[in-house]
């Protein structure tokens, strides 16, 4: 098949219309998933078995099954139950958009909860004991000592999870959501030019995730001033040392 720059450009422009919907799914599902993940992480570190076990089961279930299966269960499976169809949540569950968002949020919550748990457990026990010795209450200790350090530790893993969620929005096309991949599938059915269309879609996802990665790099730069200072001071010292040598 001959190379056709005009077709590639037209395809790229057509796929751009799917970006807002893809970003909506990614942003809202990550936000909802983060809230749920925080609760799950607290349950995991609570040292109370009746809180820890349900959180463990939830995380195991959603990490151990494919996201596509979860989307199908929510969109196709729940509608099989009459009680669900007559409940107040049915107006949402019969809409593919909300089903996709729910599946994405529930899935990312399981992964993010473990990232948060690792961040919470990374805070040195000595600092916690010192804060208690200074008379800090549990809430103040958590807010002033634990949370700031946990955020910095979990940020690299969390950024990877956000990037994965941006890519995972492509699975929403399997339940008729016309985001980037959904529009790509429609264009392929009309033109039969699979390679060109999916190459354009892949380029758009690559650009989006590059932007997300850079935003998290800037956030890490802002939250980790000692790394910034080390980077600014290390190079001049090394060059000076080489001159004296």
Curated annotation (Swiss-Prot):
- Write down the superkingdom of origin: Bacteria
Q: What is this protein called?
A: Octopine transport system permease protein OccM
The induction annotation reads: By octopine.
Pfam families reported in the protein's UniProt record: BPD_transp_1
Q: Provide the membrane topology annotation.
A: Multi-pass membrane protein
- Kindly give the PANTHER family that the UniProt entry links to this protein: ARGININE ABC TRANSPORTER PERMEASE PROTEIN ARTM (PTHR30614:SF10), MEMBRANE COMPONENT OF AMINO ACID ABC TRANSPORTER (PTHR30614)
GO molecular function (one): transmembrane transporter activity
Matching InterPro entries: AA_ABC_transptr_permease_3TM, ArtM/GltK/GlnP/TcyL/YhdX-like, MetI-like, MetI-like_sf
NCBIfam families on file: HEQRo_perm_3TM (TIGR01726)
């Amino acid at each position: 098949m001959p190379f056709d720059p005009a077709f590639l450009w037209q395809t790229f422009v057509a796929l751009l219309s799917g970006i807002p919907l893809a970003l909506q799914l990614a942003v809202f599902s990550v936000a909802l998933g983060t809230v749920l993940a925080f609760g799950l992480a607290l349950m995991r570190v609570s040292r109370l078995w009746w809180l820890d076990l349900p959180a463990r089961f939830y995380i195991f279930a959603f990490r151990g099954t494919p996201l596509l299966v979860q989307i199908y269960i929510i969109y196709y499976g729940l509608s099989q139950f009459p009680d669900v169809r007559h409940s107040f949540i049915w107006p949402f569950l019969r809409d593919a958009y909300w089903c996709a968002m729910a599946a994405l949020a529930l899935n990312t919550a399981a992964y993010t909860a473990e990232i948060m748990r690792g961040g919470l457990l990374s805070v040195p026990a000595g600092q916690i004991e010192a804060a208690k010795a200074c008379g800090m209450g549990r809430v103040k200790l958590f807010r002033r000592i634990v949370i700031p350090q946990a955020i910095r530790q979990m940020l690299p893993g969390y950024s990877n999870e956000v990037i994965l969620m941006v890519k995972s929005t492509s699975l929403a096309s399997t339940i008729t959501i016309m985001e980037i991949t959904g529009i790509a599938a429609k264009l392929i059915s009309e033109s039969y030019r699979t390679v060109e269309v999916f190459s354009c879609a892949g380029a758009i996802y690559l650009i989006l995730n590059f932007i997300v990665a850079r935003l998290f790099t800037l956030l890490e730069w802002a939250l980790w001033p000692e790394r910034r200072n080390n980077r600014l001071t290390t190079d001049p010292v090394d060059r000076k040392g080489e001159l004296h040598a």
